[in-house]
């Protein structure tokens, strides 16, 4: 019984520390400059419009662009179900915010974070871009940066919008599990 209690305490401490790290790492913006911001896709509204979460990510990339911290923006994501034109919708939104078409690249093949990373890196290689800032929700950044590094790309930092919603209560534990699944899967 003592061993089980110690195991439960150890697991709880591990989960707490990892979750705390997700918050610290995800909300820490080092202020670095990079060649490109990579906006990782997320769920859209059922009618095919941008969700508030996705718009917050795009708005964060616009801030980086206007502060001249990035020269280009990659939007990455295919979406699911009726929202299969996620990258197209993100591209259109950036255009509507006066980001020049020549400064936007779209990956419309990445349907999960691992593939977003893969296809974004291919776009970067094709366009001679060597550094990136991942733009996603704070809880997603640790795993996203891990996947970039596992793909052999170390020149990655992150910037997250200050957008929080009640669904984060579900997303944070899901991200905890996803981090270790990806870590083990890509080992």
Spans of model-derived segments:
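Cytosolic-side transmembrane helix boundary signature
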Residues: 1-2
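Hydrophobic membrane-insertion alpha-helices, especially the h-region
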Residues: 5-20
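Enrichment for repetitive, rod-forming helical segments
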Residues: 12-13, 64, 181
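A structural signal for short, hydrophobic/glycine-enriched beta-strand patches
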Residues: 19-173
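A transmembrane-helix-recognition feature enriched in membrane-embedded lipid enzymes
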Residues: 168-187
């Amino acid at each position: 019984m003592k061993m089980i209690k110690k195991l439960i305490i150890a697991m709880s401490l591990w989960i707490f520390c990892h979750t705390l790290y997700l918050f610290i790492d995800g909300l820490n913006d080092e202020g670095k400059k990079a060649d490109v911001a990579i906006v990782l896709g997320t769920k859209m509204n059922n009618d095919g419009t941008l969700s508030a979460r996705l718009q917050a990510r795009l708005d964060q990339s616009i801030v980086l662009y206007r502060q001249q911290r990035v020269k280009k923006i990659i939007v990455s994501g295919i979406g699911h179900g009726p929202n299969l034109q996620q990258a197209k919708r993100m591209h259109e939104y950036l255009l509507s915010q006066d980001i020049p078409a020549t400064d936007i690249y779209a990956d419309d093949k990445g349907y999960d974070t691992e593939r977003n990373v893969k296809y974004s890196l291919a776009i970067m290689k094709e366009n001679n871009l060597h550094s990136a800032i991942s733009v996603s929700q704070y809880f997603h950044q640790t795993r996203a940066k891990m996947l970039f590094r596992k793909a052999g790309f170390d020149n990655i930092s992150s910037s997250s919008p200050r957008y929080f919603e009640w669904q984060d209560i579900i997303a944070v534990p899901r991200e905890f599990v996803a981090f270790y699944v990806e870590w083990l899967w890509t080992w």
